[in-house]
């Protein structure tokens, strides 16, 4: 049943969490060093390993959705190994300049966590939203619906990884141009990042609209008893997967801009408001429209994240002002 599927997926997927957290650290380091190539290589490798391993476990060993979870575990840990290797190769000279006494000096560590308090709150909100999405799907006590929601969310993840690249670029370049007091370059950079993010969103709308059945077919073994029912049920909700890229065009880029400009309070506040709206919309509309309420809440949650940040910075004027100071 649905609860057993969630149980198996959770207790397999949880082993990827430590590696996932480590990758955040490595990507942050590389981005801060103005190096977007290494995070890109890591992200591409993680995705290739995730897809190939998941396909092998699902179709080669018949592990179903648990195979996808173990694919995530293998992919995340592969990403960590690659991150360590690239860090040593690229920054070997820098790494020889620190002492372990600096690493275990708790006063700087305490300040570090205070500075990153807003980012931690944002991360907790993201975890809460995605965890609740899976939990709410399971509580509907319909294995087909749980499978559909999980697969459609995986399809959306393909888009999120693409836009993450522009978010990292916006993060690194925003910090660079603000530090250099180069307002003109900052305006040009942010305009291009937002433009490319929108273009990628429109591209994925077309991809999902035309090839959503083929994308689902990657995760569903043809000829299985429930395959046709899963595809048929997914068709009832595919409109959300088409709309979500449009709603998500801005939040990924805006997050990068806020981190690069150290305006993390704006990011935190917009995330808190969006998360409250997410739960409010779901609980208000679920008795009326059922599973559609979950997808509507998620779509508006993504839309609000970007829109609120844009409004709170007065359409980025506050960010540009930092570069002009």
Describe the role of every protein-language-model region.
Residues 12-32, 39-47, 68-84, 164-167, ...:
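Short runs within selected transmembrane alpha-helices of multi-pass transporters and secretion channels
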Residues 13-20, 110-177, 197-205, 238-248, ...:
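Transmembrane helix-bundle signature of multi-pass secondary active exporters and lipid flippases
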Residues 32-33, 60-62, 140-143, 180, ...:
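Helix-loop interface residues and adjacent transmembrane-helix termini in multi-pass membrane transporters
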């Amino acid at each position: 049943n649905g609860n057993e599927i969630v149980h198996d997926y959770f207790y397999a997927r949880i082993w990827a969490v430590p590696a996932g957290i480590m990758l955040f650290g490595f990507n942050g380091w590389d981005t801060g060093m103005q190096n977007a190539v290494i995070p890109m290589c890591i992200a591409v490798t993680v995705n290739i390993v995730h897809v190939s391993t998941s396909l092998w476990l699902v179709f080669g060993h018949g592990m179903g959705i648990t195979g996808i979870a173990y694919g995530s575990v293998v992919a995340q840990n592969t990403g960590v190994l690659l991150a360590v290797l690239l860090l040593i190769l690229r920054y070997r000279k820098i790494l020889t300049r620190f002492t372990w006494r600096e690493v275990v000096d708790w006063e700087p560590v305490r300040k570090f966590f205070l500075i990153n308090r807003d980012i931690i709150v944002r991360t907790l909100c993201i975890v809460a939203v995605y965890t609740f999405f899976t939990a709410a799907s399971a509580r509907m006590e319909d294995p087909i619906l749980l499978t559909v929601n999980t697969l459609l969310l995986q399809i959306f993840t393909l888009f999120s990884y693409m836009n993450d690249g522009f978010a990292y670029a916006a993060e690194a370049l925003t910090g660079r141009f603000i530090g250099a007091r180069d307002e003109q370059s900052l305006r040009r950079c942010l305009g291009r990042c937002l433009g490319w993010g929108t273009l990628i969103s429109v591209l994925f709308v077309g991809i999902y609209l035309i090839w959503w059945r083929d994308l689902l077919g990657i995760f569903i073994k043809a000829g299985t008893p429930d395959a046709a029912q899963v595809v048929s049920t997914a068709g009832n909700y595919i409109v959300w997967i088409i709309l979500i890229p449009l709603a998500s065009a801005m939040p990924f880029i805006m997050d990068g801009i806020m981190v690069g400009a150290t305006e993390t309070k704006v990011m935190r506040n917009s995330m808190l408001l969006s998360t409250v709206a997410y739960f409010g919309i779901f609980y208000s509309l679920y008795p009326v429209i059922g599973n559609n309420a979950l997808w509507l809440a998620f779509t508006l949650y993504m839309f609000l994240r970007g829109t609120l940040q844009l409004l709170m910075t007065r359409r980025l004027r506050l960010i540009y002002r930092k570069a002009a100071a």
